[in-house]
Each structure stands twice: as structure tokens, then as C-alpha cells.
Amino acid sequence: MLRNSNMRWRLPLICFVWEIAMIVLFGIFVRYNDEADPHWPIFMKHENITSDIENDFYFRYPSFQDVHVMIFVGFGFLMTFLQRYGFGSVAFNFLLAAFGIQWALLMQGWFHTFVNGKILIGVESLINADFCVGSVCIAFGGVLGKVSPVQIMLMTLFQVTLFAVNEWILLNKLHVIDAGGSMTIHTFGAYFGLTVAWILSRPKLKQNNDKEGSTYISDLFSMIGTLFLWMYWPSFNSAISYHGDAQHRAAINTYCSLAACVLTTVAISSVVNKKGKLEMVHIQNATLAGGVAVGTAAEMMLTPYGSLIVGFICGIVSTLGFTYLSPILSNKLRLHDTCGIHNLHAIPGLIGGIVGAVTAACATEGVYTAEGLKKMFHFEGEYADRTPSIQGIYQAAGIGVSLAFGIVGGTVVGCILKLPIWGDPSDENCFDDDVYWELREEDEEEHLGAANQYITHLPENFKLPDRTEISFK
């Protein structure tokens, strides 16, 4: 079927209209909170604050910087493994994130910081908006190279909306703890993206798989994203934790889990290869699974050795998923997952939710102290009578709610994106920048003769049979 992928009017129209809408909505609703407002000195006196250094900006901004780098650099470069889709990977991630944070500030603001008809925003609002966009970046990985910029913008609009609703239900109604977003960010985002990818499945795509491979250089660029994500993940999981021991604990637990995950990923990658060699796709992705899985329990008394166990397990599970599960999903369920988000985010996200539920249910005053238990799980107000075992049940329920929002929401949005009016690429043009980007003549020649190609991100039966070794002079 012929597809009109020309974006000359569609993309400018949607960008202009939506940005104008953002300007209008921000003008009507959004204002600075007390700590960003010129009335801060008055607020200081009212709250008996003695120094400007107690402004939340100085406490949260370092974490915000780290999270911001993860969203725009980490996720963007992680997806550059596709040999002919580097521009789209980084720049479309940039586009969806830039739009998504604006819409997230509004959606999350209406649910959480809506006071007297206005949304009050501060540095913590910026962190939460980045978290919301993180779930969209995850979902984008499932459809990478197969959708148009307009479809990406539409997906961002709907997913941010669903994320805000799901987050509000989990945090405000179920009263769950999910500091690092194993449920709200990773489980929801991954299953939303996987469902959209399944709805948009292309049965003939495997016949045009030569563009889906990676090269030595593209894999190196992807490793840049991996390293940024890996280094800053402790900040991600602790960014919105309460001041003091909870935030300190979250960073330590994430640090330990990530470290353990690297070793088991390397070990299993070597074991499953007949020649004992390492697969770069495993090192790029599975090494991060420990950060995903420790997210929900990051603030809890998981203990350092418990964090190592979580990372140990996730390195194994994620690597085996890339090796054995991805081909099954592709061949049996027609679920083409470009970046392997099922193995990096979905399964580790579920593991993280389960770890959080069990850790919460096992909490005792002997471990936390009575005051610490109350502070950790916010057992106050209408939740003052909640016990750790009941909290564990609600934590488990949060997994189900996130799954439901991801799958049902992804189904609806996938059906909308499947309409033949959004300028998506044809099968033969998937995973190719040439469809939506103006490339120089020498760039196109490099694309046509990509040297040293070795396809690591595809199931075995998708790989090209005749790979020729090319030595560089």
C-alpha cells in the first residue's frame, strides 16, 4: 500500500497548534509556587525559614539535572543503535520530550498542585514532568523507526494523559510507594508501548530487515546512552524522595543493584553465545534492568545485599529475555519490539513492583522504628490505621492498575495511530532517516554502503545470512 509520508504541512501544523495551545493553557493556569515566587521572603517568615538555602531548589536541582540528562541524552542515545536511524532516534526523542514535559506540567498539575484555580509549579514539578516523559521515551522504544513524527506527537499526548491518571490513582487512591517508578513509569510505559507496537504490527517487516541492524559506530553511540543512564539512575530513583534517610537509602540501593546487574549480564551474555562472546545488545540494555527493578522499593529497607540480589536476578532475566523471549514475541505474537523494552522495562518493572510489595508487607517497627515506619509509608490522616501487610496488598494492586492502563490505553491509542492519515513510513522505509530527514549526498552513500554491519538487535531468523567482514584501512 502506498503511503504519503510527506510531513510538510502535517508536522508544522500539529507543532504550531499544540504549542499555541500550551501557551494559552499556561497563561490561564500555571503560576510559580511559593518557593519560586517573589513573595518567597514573606513565605520564609511565615514558615520560620532562616536561610535561602532552605529553598527546595537547592535541594532538588542537582537531581533534576541528572534526570533531565537521562531523558534527553540517555534515552535518546540509547536508541541510536539503528545504523540508518540515528537522527530519528535522538531528535524525535528530543521532540516528544520537549512537548511531553509541557503537557505533563499541566496534567500532573491539575491532579496534584491545583490550588485556587491555578497550577503551582516548582523544581519538583519539573522532575515529575521528566518522570512522566520517561514513560513516553520507553514506549517510543517499542515503535522506534516504524512511526511518523505526527504519530509520535499523538502518542505523547495520549500517554502523558493516561500516565497522569494512573499516577494519581496509585499515589492518591491506593496510596502506594513508588519512588523510582517501577510501576508508574516502567510497567505502564513498557506495556503501553508494547501494545501500541502490537496494534501497529507489520507482518512483512521481516522481509526488509537489512536496515534494522547496527554497526560498530552506531553501537558505540548507543553505549553513550547506556552509560549516562547507568551513572545517573541513583538520582532518578531518589529524585523526589523525602529529605534525609529515605533519599540516601534510595541512592545506595540503586547503586548496588545496578552494579550487580552488570556482572550477571556479562556472565549470561557469554553463556548463551555458542562461542562465549558478548552481545552488545545485552550490555547496552540488560545492564540497566537493576535500576528499573529496584525503583519501587528504593526508599525502603531493602538493605544493600537485598539490592545486590535484585540486580543479580534482573541481569539474568533481562539477558535471557533478549536471547529467547524476543524471538518468540516476534514470531508467535507478531510483536515487533524494536528496542527490547519488554526485557529492559516491562519484566524488570513487574519484578520491581513485586519486590516493593513484599518489602512493604515485611516492614516492622523493629526495622524502621515506629516513627520511621509512619514516615516511610505515610501512615497518617486517613491512612493512619493501615498496617504494613495491608500496604503490601495495595502495592500489589498498583501493579495490576498500571498493567491495565498500559494495555487498555495502548490498545485504544494504537487503533487511533493505525489510521492511514498520519504519514507513517512504508515497510521498506522503516528504520531509515531518509524518509523524514534531509540527508547530504555523502550521508546517503554511507547509508547505502554501511560497512562492518552486524545485526545484534534482531532475533536469529531475522538476521541477514550473508555477513561479510570488512576491514577498515
Swiss-Prot record:
Cytoplasmic face residues: 1-9, 83-86, 146-151, 201-219, 273-285, 329-343, 418-473
InterPro entries the record matches: Ammonium/urea_transptr, NH4_transpt_AmtB-like_dom, RhesusRHD
Main location: membrane
Transmembrane segment boundaries: 10-30, 62-82, 87-107, 126-145, 152-171, 180-200, 220-240, 252-272, 286-306, 308-328, 344-364, 397-417
Residues carrying a glycan: 48
A cellular component term, taken from the record's GO annotations: plasma membrane
Membrane topology, as annotated: Multi-pass membrane protein
SUPFAM superfamilies: Ammonium transporter
GO biological process, one term: ammonium homeostasis
Cell compartments where the protein resides: Apical cell membrane
Membrane-side (Extracellular) residue stretches: 31-61, 108-125, 172-179, 241-251, 307, 365-396
UniProt entry keywords in alphabetical sequence: Ammonia transport, Cell membrane, Glycoprotein, Membrane, Transmembrane, Transmembrane helix, Transport
Domain of life where this protein originates: Eukaryota
Gene3D superfamilies: Ammonium transporter AmtB like domains
GO MF term set: ammonium channel activity
Subunit structure: Homotrimer.
Role, per record: Functions as an ammonia transporter.
Family: Belongs to the ammonium transporter (TC 2.A.49) family. Rh subfamily.
PANTHER family: AMMONIUM TRANSPORTER, AMMONIUM TRANSPORTER RH TYPE C
Name of the protein: Ammonium transporter Rh type C
Species per Swiss-Prot/TrEMBL record: Xenopus laevis (African clawed frog)
